[in-house]
Amino acid sequence: AVSCGQVDTALTPCLTYLTKGGTPSTQCCSGVRSLKSMTGTKVPDRQAACNCLKQAAARYQGIKDAAAALSQKCGVQLSVPISRSTDCSKIS
């Protein structure tokens, strides 16, 4: 299963982008790709990652727009949204 430690480690390089905006770093996009591979095909992994992302998003105010654009800016299609308001039980 996916742990919150793994999710946090993958997205730590994105904190500057998420809190200040601009362009995500190469390390950040690499973390996003890593997160995509972690959440690949198994629903429990996606739901676990979703819950971790919700907790992480709740720790930082004002990251909503930056977080929503992150996968697009990195050119990675995530199966899990980075949002405080996602109902993780509905992710399939």
Swiss-Prot record:
One Pfam family here: Tryp_alpha_amyl
GO BP annotations, alphabetical order: lipid transport
Tissue specificity: Expressed in seeds and, at very low levels, in pulp of fruit (at protein level).
GO molecular function: lipid binding
S-S bridge residues: C4-C52, C14-C28, C29-C74, C50-C88
InterPro entries given in the database record: Bifun_inhib/LTP/seed_sf, Bifunc_inhib/LTP/seed_store, Plant_nsLTP
Leader peptide range in chain numbering: none
Assigned keywords, A-Z: Allergen, Disulfide bond, Lipid-binding, Transport
Described purpose of this protein according to its UniProt entry: Plant non-specific lipid-transfer proteins transfer phospholipids as well as galactolipids across membranes. May play a role in wax or cutin deposition in the cell walls of expanding epidermal cells and certain secretory tissues.
Family, as annotated: Belongs to the plant LTP family.
Name of the featured protein: Non-specific lipid-transfer protein 1
Species annotation: Actinidia deliciosa
Lineage, top ranks: Eukaryota, Viridiplantae, Streptophyta, Embryophyta, Tracheophyta
